[in-house]
From Swiss-Prot:
It is a multi-pass membrane protein. Its main location: endoplasmic reticulum. GO terms for cellular component: COPII-coated ER to Golgi transport vesicle; cytosol; endoplasmic reticulum exit site; endoplasmic reticulum membrane; endoplasmic reticulum-Golgi intermediate compartment membrane; Golgi membrane; nuclear membrane. The di-lysine motif confers endoplasmic reticulum localization for type I membrane proteins. One of its GO terms (biological process) is endoplasmic reticulum to Golgi vesicle-mediated transport. A motif (Di-lysine motif) lies at residues 266-269. Disruption phenotype: Embryonic lethality between 3.5 and 9.5 dpc. Conditional deletion in the liver depletes plasma lipids and protects mice from atherosclerosis. GO terms for molecular function: cargo receptor activity; COPII receptor activity. This is Surfeit locus protein 4. Endoplasmic reticulum cargo receptor that mediates the export of lipoproteins by recruiting cargos into COPII vesicles to facilitate their secretion. Acts as a cargo receptor for lipoproteins bearing both APOB and APOA1, thereby regulating lipoprotein delivery and the maintenance of lipid homeostasis. Synergizes with the GTPase SAR1B to mediate transport of circulating lipoproteins. Promotes the secretion of PCSK9. Also mediates the efficient secretion of erythropoietin (EPO). Keywords: Endoplasmic reticulum, Golgi apparatus, Membrane, Protein transport, Transmembrane, Transmembrane helix, Transport. Found in a complex composed at least of SURF4, TMED2 and TMED10. May interact with LMAN1. Interacts with ZFYVE27 and with KIF5A in a ZFYVE27-dependent manner. Interacts with STING1. Interacts with SAR1B. Interacts with TMEM41B. The gene is Surf4. InterPro entries: Surf1/Surf4, Surf4.
Length: 269
């Protein structure tokens, strides 16, 4: 009974949090979600020559193609961020940002680095949720018009987004025998499964937001490293990519799990 009371209290807190923040939570979620693209686009501007030289050296593609790659990254990411934040042509912005992820995955050889590949896939999951949200906003203009129960593409995008988001947490698991690591892995894995299958989704996603934010601030504190050290850029990249996944989880909290989830199926039972 005590355990049920604790779970009930936690769910009440999550519902209360959502009621208080429902006006601005989607805005915060979108800002967090695009933060890695915004930071990377700005970095392309300030590190133009370094990025160009890296691409030229890695792919031997020449000055012109390397410069075009950097320009495409800069323009594509900053334009996509502006469109998402202004809620204009959000679907096109998402497709453009998907393209940037794919381009960077190949150009920076992320395809062969499992950890970074999983984080890029998690970032793609956040964009899928943003795409689903934009479809919801588009359909809301036709409120009252008879439609099917729910758009299948939208609910499957939400499912795919949830599943991809949890890949981020698989990169945080620690495979050692310490008591703290074992507890952290058990709790983290349980929360990941809950989000993926859509059970107690808002509470599980909100808990993961708090946990991931704490880990991010502790392990990726780039502001404590001098700017001239390579570790500064590495931690900054990691920090903002993690913030983007947090943004995706906040979208799950704000929008719910969608039609393909245990929470929705419970309503039919």
């Amino acid at each position: 009974m005590g355990q049920n009371d604790l779970m009930g209290t936690a769910e009440d807190f999550a519902d209360q949090f959502l009621r208080v923040t429902k006006q601005y939570l989607p805005h915060v979620a979108r800002l967090c979600l695009i933060s890695t693209f915004l930071e990377d686009g700005i970095r392309m501007w300030f590190q133009w020559s370094e990025q160009r030289d890296y691409i030229d050296t890695t792919w031997s593609c020449g000055y012109l193609l390397a410069s075009s790659f950097v320009f495409l990254n800069l323009l594509g990411q900053l334009t996509g961020c502006v469109l998402v934040l202004s809620r204009n042509f959000v679907q096109y912005a998402c497709f453009g940002l998907f393209g940037i992820i794919a381009l960077q995955t190949i150009a920076y050889s992320i395809l062969w680095d499992l950890k970074f590949l999983m984080r890029n896939l998690a970032l793609g999951g956040g964009l899928l949720l943003l795409l689903a949200e934009s479809r919801s906003e588009g359909k809301s203009m036709f409120a009252g018009v008879p439609t099917m129960r729910e758009s299948s593409p939208k609910q499957y995008m939400q499912l795919g987004g949830r599943v991809l988001l949890v890949l981020m947490f698989m990169t945080l698991l620690h495979f050692d025998a310490s008591f703290f690591s074992i507890i952290q892995n058990i709790v983290g894995t349980a929360l990941m499964i809950l989000v993926a299958i859509g059970f107690k989704t808002k509470l599980a996603a909100l808990t993961l937001v708090v946990w991931l934010f704490a880990i991010n601030v502790y392990f990726n504190a780039f502001w404590t490293i001098p700017v001239y050290k390579p570790m500064h850029d590495f931690l900054k990249y990691d920090f903002f990519q993690t913030m983007s996944v947090i943004g995706g989880l906040l979208l799950v909290v704000a929008l719910g799990p969608g039609g393909v989830s245990m929470d929705e199926k419970k309503k039919e039972w």
